[in-house]
Regions:
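Short acidic, low-complexity intrinsically disordered linear motifs used
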Residues: 1-10
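A cross-family detector of function-defining hotspots
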Residues: 16-147
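Short, aromatic-enriched amphipathic alpha-helices that serve as compact interaction elements
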Residues: 11-15
Length: 147
């Protein structure tokens, strides 16, 4: 019988995109083995302040604020008032609001970018900042300069 690590590595060999595999292996070193997996995604629960972290075997081109690829999703519990739905969507297509679950997610190319995105959403909901694409992009670019 195969151990989980062998099974996981065999699963990675079937993924179409290399970057999500590399990032998933990095997360394994940080968080340990994923809590769930399918043929095309991995999931960790309650890690690093997130409700869940999901890496998918996808590589989505995203042009804002600069061209990059998205494949990692992070979620938190947060009720976003409907009045912010459109302004947040206009700020970034990476902001994912699920009104039924009362959660908000971010899809970016790193956990750090997701944390920056979700902090932006929390600041908008708390009305500490106006929801604008310029403010969102400023935060992402500032985060990138730090790393």
């Amino acid at each position: 019988m195969k151990n989980f690590k062998t099974f996981l590595n065999e699963s990675y060999s079937n993924w179409e995109n290399d970057e999500p595999v590399s990032y998933a292996k990095h997360l394994e070193k940080t968080f340990g083995s994923p809590d769930e997996m399918t043929d095309s995604q991995l999931c960790w629960f309650n890690k690093d302040g997130f409700k869940r972290i999901v890496i998918k075997d996808e590589y989505i081109l995203h042009g804002s604020p600069a061209p990059h690829y998205d494949f990692i999703y992070c979620y938190i519990d947060s009720r976003v008032p409907e009045k912010f739905a459109e302004p947040l969507a206009e700020s970034s297509g990476s902001i994912l609001i699920d009104y039924l679950k009362g959660e908000v997610g971010a899809r970016c190319g790193s956990i750090t970018a997701n944390a920056t995105t979700l902090n932006y959403v929390l600041d908008v909901v708390a009305e500490r900042v106006s929801p604008t694409k310029m403010e969102y992009e400023r935060r992402i670019l500032e985060m990138k300069r730090m790393f």
